[in-house]
From Swiss-Prot:
It catalyses: 5-(methylsulfanyl)-D-ribulose 1-phosphate = 5-methylsulfanyl-2,3-dioxopentyl phosphate + H2O; 5-methylsulfanyl-2,3-dioxopentyl phosphate + H2O = 1,2-dihydroxy-5-(methylsulfanyl)pent-1-en-3-one + phosphate. Mg(2+) binds at residues 281, 283, 476. It comes from Zea mays. GO terms for biological process: L-methionine salvage from methylthioadenosine. Binds 1 zinc ion per subunit. Its EC number is 4.2.1.109, 3.1.3.77. NCBIfam families: enolase-ppase, HAD-SF-IA-v1, salvage_mtnB. This is Probable bifunctional methylthioribulose-1-phosphate dehydratase/enolase-phosphatase E1. Gene3D superfamilies: 1.10.720.60, Class II aldolase/adducin N-terminal domain, HAD superfamily/HAD-like. GO terms for molecular function: acireductone synthase activity; magnesium ion binding; methylthioribulose 1-phosphate dehydratase activity; zinc ion binding. In the N-terminal section; belongs to the aldolase class II family. MtnB subfamily. In the C-terminal section; belongs to the HAD-like hydrolase superfamily. MasA/MtnC family. Substrate 1 binds at residue 114.
Length: 517
């Protein structure tokens, strides 16, 4: 926990002292960054003086958020880096120690142009180290799907090396557009970090990648995994293999006209036949509303206290609580009914949990579609599915349709207000078995509000279609249908038992079963 008041000022002053700056922790951090620069140069990540590395000083007596920062300089040959070349900064980015100028032809010392971006990763993610690589694979990978806002890959072993991911998961890396100057990327990087709470990296189109971790070892390991995966995807592209689907089928297979790189489209009279991709809502579309309202929501509500109590000190739950605190603070400022203040951690575990439970119960009762709630619910449901206390329910026509679309080469995605993890849990544990093999990806509220047109525009960019009209969206919610239609999607409204009535003359095609498509 960060220090405060006079004690904080004293601590900062002590760390800014010459004795501390020349002490073992700072010296070791300087040497580490120099060593990593030389190592990454050999990997081809920081050639031509490009790329950069930063780490927090490893001093266990100081909270991570308050530790000093060591950054590599700009314009220096990375393979010749030494500890004396490094900049040392306070936790707020203030330079405390700068390198001494070297004779010509060396350039005057200058801190890395990545500094403001590194600071965002430190402040927004609580990182312990950040790596910026110009590895050629990080540049080429963003060119494979022009205009895409995300890079997606699934079912590859090295995905397990990325925090919070497993072999079966879909790894999603946000892509931001390059700018003439590095510092101009700061806002778009911040937006990507905020929009993708699970991400530990951001790609910059035609440029490189930023990777962060809780320690230099974690950041380095993940960076190696990202480079491996991106390089593998480029090679798969050259071989005509689709890396975005579980089965990794052929990109140019005539039975797979939907492929992310294939321009051909099937000709046919049915909606799915004229689409490269199908995007499905869950509640009221693939799954009865009653299952969500009568089974899933009550399970999360009834187990939230138990979950928070038993996992309070877990990193995953700490992140959940952090997101809830941010949402609750915003709710309090906006006068949202049911929002109650959450005491600081010093107030005691029980008091914090009591207030969180009250807020979560209020959020569930109001059926709020917010990321902080959906992420926590997903973690609670995960335990329920693991214990076999929950089993996913889908309408009987859904597995048949998914199988047929899959066999026809049509990619199917899910877009739900539930977290991506919750989506995978539901479809991976249904009464019809594991249906995830028929699904190519998952979108949730990190993409955007389901009733906003821009969310569907983002999805169309991510799927790499030539036109949004090549995407069929099926939902039970009229407002979502309007938003998707305004984004150029083809839209069908699902009529299922328990769904809300539609307005007269709504203008959309409706179905009562996927067999009608």
């Amino acid at each position: 926990m960060a220090c405060s008041g006079c004690s904080c000022e004293a601590a900062v002053g002590a760390m800014a002292s010459e004795a501390y700056l020349e002490g073992a922790p700072v010296r070791e951090a300087r040497e580490l960054v120099a060593e990593l620069c030389r190592h990454f140069y050999a990997q081809g990540w920081v050639t031509g003086t490009g790329g950069s590395i930063t780490v927090k000083v490893n001093d266990p007596t100081v909270p991570l958020a308050d530790r000093l920062i060591v950054m590599s300089p700009s314009g220096v040959q990375k393979e010749r880096m030494v500890a004396e070349d490094m900049y040392v900064m306070a936790a707020d980015g203030k330079v405390l120690s700068a390198p001494v100028a070297k004779p010509w032809p060396n350039k005057p010392p200058k801190c890395t142009d990545c500094a403001p971006l590194f600071m965002k990763a430190y402040l927004m993610r609580g990182a312990g180290a950040v790596i910026h690589s110009h590895g050629i694979e990080t540049c080429i990978a963003t060119m494979l799907i022009p205009g895409a806002k995300e890079f997606r890959v699934t079912h590859m072993e090295m995905i397990k090396g990325i925090k919070g991911h497993g072999y079966h998961d879909e790894l999603v890396i946000p892509i931001i557009e390059n700018t003439p100057y590095e510092y101009e990327l700061t806002d778009s990087l911040s937006e990507a970090i905020a929009a993708y709470p699970k991400a530990t990296a951001v790609l910059v189109r035609n440029h490189g990648i930023y990777v962060w971790g809780e320690s230099w070892i974690n950041a380095k390991t993940q960076a190696e995994c990202y480079h491996y995966l991106l390089d593998a995807c480029i090679k798969l592209y050259q071989l005509g293999i689709d890396w975005t689907t579980p089965e990794h089928g052929s990109i140019n297979n005539p039975r797979r006209p939907h492929s992310i790189l294939s321009p051909e489209i099937c000709n046919g009279c049915h909606a799915a036949d004229s689409s490269k991709c199908v995007v499905l809502d869950i509640e009221g579309t693939t799954t009865p509303i009653s299952f969500v309202t009568d089974v899933m929501f009550p399970y999360a509500r009834d187990n939230v206290r138990k979950h928070l109590t038993s996992t309070f000190d877990f990193e995953e739950t700490k992140e959940d609580i952090k997101l809830l605190r941010i949402q609750i603070e915003d709710d309090l400022q906006n006068g949202v009914a049911g929002a109650v203040p959450v005491p600081p951690d010093e107030g005691g575990k029980e008091e914090v949990i009591n207030s969180l439970v009250a807020n979560v119960e209020s959020m569930i009762k109001a059926d709020r579609k917010i990321t902080s709630l959906k992420q926590l619910q997903g973690h609670i449901w995960r335990i329920g599915f693991q214990k076999k206390e929950l089993q996913g329910v889908v309408f009987e026509d859904v597995p048949v349709a998914l199988k047929n679309w899959h066999a026809s080469g049509i990619k199917v995605y899910i877009y739900s207000s539930g977290s991506r993890e919750a989506q995978r849990l539901l479809f991976g544990n249904t009464t019809y078995g594991d249906l995830r093999k028929f699904l190519c990806g998952y979108f949730d509220t990190t993409t955007g509000n389901k009733r906003e047109t821009r969310s569907y525009f983002e999805i169309s960019q991510s799927l790499g279609v030539d036109s949004p009209s090549q995407i069929l969206f099926i939902t039970d919610v009229f407002q979502e249908a309007i938003a998707a239609k305004n984004a150029g999607f083809e839209v069908i409204i699902s009529i299922r038992p328990g769904n809300a009535p539609l307005p007269d003359n709504h203008g959309f095609r409706t179905i009562k079963s996927f067999s009608e498509i």
